[in-house]
Amino acid sequence: RYVLAATLSSNVGLYGPAYELLDHEPYPGKEENNHSEKYQLKAWDLDKPGNIRAEIARMNAIRNKHEAFQRTFNIHFIPCSNSHIIAYLKQNFEKTDRFIVVVNMDWENQQGGKLDLTAKALDLGHTGTLRLVDHFADAPKEYLWDDKKPYLELNPQKCPAHIFQIID
């Protein structure tokens, strides 16, 4: 969810510890969080296993470095053969900072699908191989796509999203 919030809009915020630690246990019989700070002072264990602090920091570094994520009205959605996957193009006005963001909307199951990069609205302008670098991976990883309908899989436990920078 944070990848979506951080890439779809130029403005994003979150309530820190509960979100970073994935604390989502509901109070019995209510929607409210069982460990809410509403009526108590809480000392959070920020190093608790299973936190997503590194992913949030990585996403924030990407946002700060790239102009494409500092604008809101520069989104072009990319069709995908699987409705559990959302994909879109983000780019600056000059089209010198361009990204394809792909997110698995199913937080429990691995999902795979083909992206349709043939739409004229995307204006990718490539006729051959598309060179990409995934900045959301633990370490930047390069990909070469020869197909205008590339297939990819996203595992929510290992790789829930890709943030591909298009390298010209």
Kindly give the residue locations of the regions a language model identified.
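Hydrophobic faces of well-ordered beta-strands that scaffold small-molecule active sites
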Residues: 12-16
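Carbohydrate-interacting/catalytic domains
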Residues: 1, 6-9, 19-168
